[in-house]
């Protein structure tokens, strides 16, 4: 029976060895970590991993070792032979034999051995007899139960490099006998695996049974390679202690400072992390985000002062853009403020605004906007305005043509000094001098010097072309070229005088004002020169004859108020130029109101040359029949020329005669001297007769507006005349005698 049962025993033992309970080796708990020395629960089965008589296992944490495939012990009869088969510990445990640390002590030893690597195997135990040899690498002939010292320094088992999972038994794992379970397939070379560490053999570990890897946590599909991209699970499968996590942290820290140019050697992750770039000298390398931000900030600050010409070498940022030691003094090169430098648009605009405030500096002198900036060009020197040109020489006004010889009346009318007119001329000249016409053309402010300001002011043709003499006073004055052609009409005044230059340098506005004033009183003539208003005292009143048409200087061609140069318009007076077209138009309109005399030779019609000297009496003048035709033969030549007895004539309907017919040849009518030509009767003073064609100068004459004579006291229509004094009275304004207005004489009331 015994012999019959013997062949069946291996099968039974094999069956029991497959069971989980039997895999713990012997009777669990009999001896911590191991089975029963020598026999175990099943006699003859042995402990599996222990040599003969060594019942103490080396399970981690007091856990009994799992027997290897060959850990069935010896196959002696009924297992009575020591189970020191090839399986077991075989060559021994090196420095930490199982018997030395039974129980819990063996667990600590195993843990330390697993961490440090198993030491070199000692002298192997006695190989078991028969049985199925294990896959492990049996050691030498060890002595069971004897501690085999390892070779490691300080009693520590040394690391044995090798393929697969290094350890005491290359290719077999930490403990011998595990060859089949861990057939030399490690996850990472140099990383020991064993009990307490997840096995990484095929079909085990994180990827076991998960084809393609884990699913991504945020999508439905699977990531390439089976591991979610960028997910923490990507580290799955790496055993603890491999350094994967630490390497990732180090890489992250290194990325923070920028990758060093020199990667560094091994454990020192390049000095790169400390200093971006190469490391020792800051700023020499590429630089990291922080350096880029600082550079951008410095560039922005530099832009505020303008870009430097020299880029600079880093040094003190922002002191001077680009070069810098002195911040912002000179955009561009620095050193000399404002010399060159491109500057920035904002800076240029500010400089331009400041320069405009004080006036633009002289370009090319010094620095634009600096220094001379306050001196706005040279405009401060307004020429030599004090010298009002040569206008003071108003021609030879005293000789207004030959007007003074109009009939031998009075004090040789037309030749005299000019009386009040001289005062008026002086006054006008003084006013003109107040503005001055300057002699230096092109300098100063407009108006201060001719040639600046308004063209034609001051110098060119000052006062009169040729200054006084040619064309003024003498030739062309009075008779040809003055009185008639060009006077009052276009071309009066003098070219260049008229509008621009009424008052030298006064400009258009002042000219307009002066023209308006001149138009009010009649053009020109107020000042000596060609002005007919004043020159020739004779024409105004002197001698009874003067009041008589044809003889009086008031009208005929040369006479006082109108003749030739005379009249209210001659364009040379203190207000040069007969004023503007407006004045001429106004005068023409007013003259047209009373009719423009044809002028002609005085005396062509009876009454035109009444009594050469004007015999005072009832019917002065040659006569006509008084009272038949109003205004003809009306006495009044009397003592004061023109004073006579007004309204002697009788008109139809007992209507008093109208005095708006001056120049009809009847001297003294209403104090309005006859022979004033243009006025009143139009072409024929007495109907077809009158002054006859050509009496007086066309367009001139005193017209009823300016009754002449010293004693013209009768207003139009019997209205008392308004008193005007001074020069205005002398110029033919009614009431010019006996004015007591003093300094207000001739002034307009407000």
UniProtKB/Swiss-Prot annotation:
sequence repeat extents: 83-127, 219-262, 263-318, 319-393, 394-482, 483-554, 555-619, 620-686
Kindly list the cysteine pairs connected by disulfide bridges: 739-745
**Location of this chain's protein in the cell:** Secreted, Extracellular space, Extracellular matrix
Gene Ontology CC: extracellular region
Protein name, please?
Elastin
Family assignment from sequence similarity? Belongs to the elastin family.
Check the record and name the InterPro entries matching this protein.
Tropoelastin (IPR003979)
Q: What is its main location?
A: secreted
Region listing for 8 X tandem repeats, in residue ranges: 83-686
What post-translational modification does the entry describe?
Answer: Elastin is formed through the cross-linking of its soluble precursor tropoelastin. Cross-linking is initiated through the action of lysyl oxidase on exposed lysines to form allysine. Subsequent spontaneous condensation reactions with other allysine or unmodified lysine residues result in various bi-, tri-, and tetrafunctional cross-links. The most abundant cross-links in mature elastin fibers are lysinonorleucine, allysine aldol, desmosine, and isodesmosine.
**Function of the protein:** Major structural protein of tissues such as aorta and nuchal ligament, which must expand rapidly and recover completely.
4-hydroxyproline carried by residues: 32, 67, 102, 176, 189, 192, 211, 276, 345, 363, 368, 441, 455, 480, 576, 635, 720
What is the protein's quaternary organization? The polymeric elastin chains are cross-linked together into an extensible 3D network.
Q: Which UniProt keywords apply?
A: Disulfide bond, Extracellular matrix, Hydroxylation, Repeat, Secreted, Signal
Instruction: Give one GO term, molecular function aspect.
Output: extracellular matrix structural constituent
Whichever gene encodes this chain, its name is: ELN
UniProt signal peptide: 1-24
């Amino acid at each position: 029976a015994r012999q019959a049962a013997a062949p069946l025993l291996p099968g039974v033992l094999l069956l029991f060895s497959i069971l989980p309970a039997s895999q713990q080796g012997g009777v669990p708990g009999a001896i911590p970590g191991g089975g029963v020395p020598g026999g175990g629960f099943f006699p003859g089965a042995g402990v599996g991993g222990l040599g003969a008589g060594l019942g103490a296992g080396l399970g981690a944490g007091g856990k009994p070792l799992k027997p290897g495939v060959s850990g069935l012990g010896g196959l002696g009869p009924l297992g009575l032979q020591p189970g020191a088969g090839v399986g077991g510990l075989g060559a021994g445990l090196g420095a930490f034999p199982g018997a030395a640390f039974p129980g819990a002590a063996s667990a600590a030893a195993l843990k330390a051995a697993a961490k440090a690597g198993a030491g070199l195997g000692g002298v192997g135990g006695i190989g078991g007899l028969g049985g199925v040899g294990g896959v492990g690498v049996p050691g030498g002939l060890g002595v069971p139960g004897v501690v085999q010292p390892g070779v490691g320094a300080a009693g520590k088992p040394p690391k044995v490099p090798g393929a697969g999972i290094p350890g005491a038994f290359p290719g077999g794992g930490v403990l011998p006998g595990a060859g089949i379970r861990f057939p030399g397939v490690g996850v990472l070379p140099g990383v020991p695996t064993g009990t307490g560490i997840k096995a990484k053999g095929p079909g085990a570990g994180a990827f076991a049974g998960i084809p393609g890897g884990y699913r991504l946590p945020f999508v439905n599909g699977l990531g390439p390679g089976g591991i979610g991209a960028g997910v923490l699970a990507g580290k799955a499968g790496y055993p603890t202690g491999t350094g994967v996590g630490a390497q990732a942290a180090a890489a992250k820290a290194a990325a923070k400072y920028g990758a060093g140019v020199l990667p560094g050697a091994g454990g020192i992750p390049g000095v790169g992390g400390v200093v971006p770039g190469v490391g020792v000298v800051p700023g020499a390398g590429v630089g990291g985000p922080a350096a880029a931000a600082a550079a951008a900030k410095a560039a922005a600050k530099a832009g505020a002062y303008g870009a430097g010409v020299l880029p600079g070498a880093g040094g003190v940022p922002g002191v001077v853009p680009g070069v810098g030691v002195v911040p912002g003094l000179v955009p561009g090169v620095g050193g000399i403020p404002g010399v060159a430098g491109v500057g920035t648009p904002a800076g240029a605009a500010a400089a331009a605004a400041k320069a405009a405030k004080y006036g633009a500096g002289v370009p090319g002198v010094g620095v634009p906007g600096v220094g001379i900036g306050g001196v706005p060009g040279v405009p401060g020197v307004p020429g030599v305005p004090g010298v009002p040109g040569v206008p003071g020489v108003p021609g030879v006004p005293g000789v207004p043509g030959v007007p003074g010889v109009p009939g031998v009346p009075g004090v040789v009318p037309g030749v005299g000094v000019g009386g009040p007119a001289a005062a008026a001329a002086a006054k006008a000249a003084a006013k003109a001098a107040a503005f001055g016409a300057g002699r230096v053309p092109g300098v100063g402010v407009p108006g201060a010097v001719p040639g600046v300001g308004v063209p034609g002011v001051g110098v060119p043709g000052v006062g009169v072309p040729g200054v006084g003499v040619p064309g003024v006073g003498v030739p062309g004055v009075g008779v040809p070229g003055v009185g008639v052609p060009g006077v009052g009409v276009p071309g009066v005044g003098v070219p260049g005088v008229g509008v621009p230059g009424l008052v030298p340098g006064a400009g258009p506005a002042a000219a307009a004002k002066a023209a308006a004033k001149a138009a009010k009183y009649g053009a020109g003539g107020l000042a000596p020169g060609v002005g007919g208003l004043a020159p020739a005292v004779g024409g105004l009143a002197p001698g009874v004859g003067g009041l008589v048409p044809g003889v009086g200087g008031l009208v005929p061609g040369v006479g006082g108020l109108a003749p030739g140069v005379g009249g209210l318009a001659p364009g040379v007076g203190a207000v040069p130029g007969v004023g503007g077209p407006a004045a001429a138009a106004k005068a023409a309109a007013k003259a047209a109101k009373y009719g423009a005399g044809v002028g002609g030779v005085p005396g062509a019609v009876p009454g035109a040359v009444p009594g050469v000297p004007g015999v005072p009496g009832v019917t002065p003048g040659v006569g006509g029949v008084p009272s038949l035709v109003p205004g003809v033969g009306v006495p009044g030549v009397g003592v004061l020329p023109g004073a006579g007895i007004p309204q002697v004539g009788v008109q139809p309907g007992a209507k008093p005669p109208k005095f708006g017919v001056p120049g009809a040849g009847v001297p003294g009518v209403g104090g309005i001297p006859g022979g004033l030509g243009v006025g009143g009767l139009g072409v024929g003073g007495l109907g077809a007769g009158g002054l006859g064609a050509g009496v007086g100068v066309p367009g001139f004459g005193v017209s009823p507006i300016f009754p002449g004579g010293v004693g013209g006291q009768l207003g139009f229509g019997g209205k008392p005349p308004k008193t005007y004094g001074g020069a205005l009275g002398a110029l033919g304004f009614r009431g010019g005698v006996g004015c007591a207005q003093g300094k207000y004489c001739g002034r307009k009331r407000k």
